[in-house]
A protein has these predicted regions:
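Metal-dependent nuclease catalytic cores that hydrolyze phosphodiester bonds in DNA/RNA
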Residues: 1-114, 245-283
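Cys/His-rich finger/ribbon microdomains and the adjacent scaffold used
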Residues: 2, 8, 37-39, 45, ...
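Conserved DEDDh/DEDDy metal-dependent 3′-5′ exonuclease domain
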Residues: 89-97, 103-107, 118-121, 133-198, ...
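Conserved RNase H-like, two-metal-ion catalytic cores of nucleic-acid enzymes
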Residues: 97, 289-368, 389
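Acidic, Mg2+-coordinating catalytic module of metal-dependent nucleases/exonucleases
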Residues: 162-234, 254, 431-503
Length: 503
């Protein structure tokens, strides 16, 4: 039987079935790109944390499985770890231990006068998931204790969200070290029983389990699509606008799963509109509401969209962990009624801090006191506020832009225009294909270059700095095309609103 790793143990704690599927049906895993990006950032943080206590020995060892793939060589890692312990090494990174089919690699094993302390590294900035972290570390302590290691302390290393890059990067200032011994002590007695249960379950057939809160708590399960297949129809109660997952589960467990089942339930106005339009396969248009919204727009009219990067490790002076750094914008505009649609844009180089140049060009491209639209303007307004704070000399103009932004999301969120294809979402990625189902020009899936959503843009931009000239050129084009489509989409939505209000 395969070894039970700490990640598998944590999966078992959330849902035993998920562990079985991870072991025997990994092809069913579906991971959101943003979740994968968080995993990747966690790896970066782990590498950085190894420097916390000075010199260290790295136990990580790989074995080549074919020309392109590698996997961890667990046996070699445990041998290297034991050698480092015998030599009195003070810090061992990824210290590996194997006991009775249970395997773990400790992020940092730090020598103390009486034994060793476990330091578990997380890319979080708070302790909101302390119960899960304690399960993780308790499992490690269990394995180490059974390997004869005297564990003298258990600590969680996470990110200080108040850290600001000022001069040289300070690895000690970047991290917080938290003593979680009490939380680990509370979890420790549960480990042997859970380990036995997990091993027994893995020896059997696929377990049966109902959908529950654990499907998304504490983490989104990558097997949701697999487990809900054949159980949850489309559309369903899970698609109702702003209905919590917990509430949707309650309805499902009481026998209400389809929208038809929800006819006699108390719903919000928007949910009721969604239900009626979907079941009746009809479009709802409130012309008066749309006309009232359109009176808020005036020429010259600008359509603005930002893209940001959000790195866990600050890259630019004055920034903090996970700060949204605006690196790109697209701007379509029409100067007067019947005027030509024009476009301008900005994109950083991926190497230097793009914010000052972006802010300067934005102030040049958008005059004072003009009407600008954004889709879900809270995002753009927050970025503008941050730019104004970073560059006080540009602040008056930037704040003026912010104060004249009208949200193009408003008429859709208000329910003035609804089509069944929106499926309870007013995201531009849902609204656009619902209103223009046959317009290939507006289909994000037709974009080439690997950038078809904001998450992909966020992930690929930081990589530009290390790309070849040809790769950078291709990526730059892909980013420009994607962001341009966002603002073109806004123009098309505005035109559609004008058209239906006049029909």
């Amino acid at each position: 039987m395969p070894n039970l790793s700490k990640s598998k143990y944590i999966t078992f704690c959330q849902c035993p079935k998920a562990l079985w599927l991870k072991q025997y049906k990994p092809e069913e895993i579906v991971i959101d790109p943003l979740v994968q990006a968080r995993f990747d950032s966690g790896t970066q943080v782990g590498e950085l944390a190894k420097r916390l206590f000075g010199d260290f020995v790295e136990a990580t060892t790989y074995i080549q499985t074919d020309d392109t793939a590698q996997r961890l060589d667990l046996r070699a890692m445990t041998v290297l770890t034991q050698k480092a312990i015998a030599e009195g090494v003070e810090n061992i990174a990824e210290a590996a231990f194997l006991y009775g089919g249970c395997y773990c690699a400790v992020d940092i094993l730090h020598k103390t006068p009486q034994g060793y302390a476990i330091y578990e590294v997380k890319s979080s900035t708070d302790l909101s998931q302390l119960d899960v972290y304690a399960q993780d570390v308790a499992y490690q302590k269990y394995v180490l204790a059974n390997c004869g290691i005297n564990v003298t302390g258990t600590y969680l290393v996470n990110i200080d969200n108040e850290y600001v890059l000022d001069g040289e990067f300070d690895v000690k200032g970047f991290f917080n070290i938290n003593d979680i011994s009490q939380a680990v002590a509370n979890e420790y007695p549960k480990v042997p029983g859970r380990v036995a249960q997990a091993k027994k379950m893995l020896e059997g057939n696929e377990p049966q389990r109902d959908l529950g809160e654990y499907c998304h708590k504490p983490y989104d399960c990558p097997f949701w699509e697999y487990c809900s297949r054949g159980i949850v129809p489309h559309p369903s109660v899970f698609d109702l606008y702003r209905m919590s997952f917990k509430k949707s589960l309650e309805h499902m467990h009481e026998g209400r799963i389809t929208l038809e089942d929800m006819r006699n339930e108390k719903l919000s106005d928007t949910q009721q509109l969604q239900l009626e339009c979907t079941l009746g396969n009809k479009t709802y248009i409130n012309k008066d509401g749309i006309k009232e919204f359109l009176t808020k727009l005036s020429y010259p009219l600008y359509f603005l969209d930002f893209e940001t990067e959000q790195t866990v490790i600050p890259k630019y002076q004055g920034t903090h962990p996970y700060q949204q750094v605006t690196f790109q914008y697209s701007l379509h505009y029409i100067e007067h009624e019947g005027g030509e649609l024009k476009h301008t844009e900005f994109l950083g180089d991926g190497k230097t801090d793009p914010r000052r140049a972006l802010a300067e060009q934005l102030c040049h491209d958008i005059p004072l006191n003009v009407c600008t639209t954004a889709y879900n303007k809270a995002f753009e307004c927050t970025r503008l506020k941050e730019l104004a704070e970073a560059y006080p000399d540009l602040a008056p103009h930037i704040i003026n832009i912010r104060d004249h932004i009208v949200d193009l999301l408003d008429p859709f969120r208000a329910g003035y225009y609804y089509k069944p294809a929106m499926n309870g979402s007013f995201s531009i990625k849902k609204v656009l294909p619902a209103l223009f189902p046959d317009d290939l020009q507006l289909d994000y899936h037709n974009l080439s270059g690997g950038v078809q959503n904001g998450g992909e843009a966020m992930n690929i931009y930081p990589l530009m700095a290390s790309m070849t000239v040809e790769e950078r050129k291709k990526t730059r084009r892909a980013l420009l095309d994607y962001c341009c489509l966002d603002t073109l989409a806004m123009v098309k939505l505005w035109e559609k609103l004008r058209k239906v209000s006049e029909e």
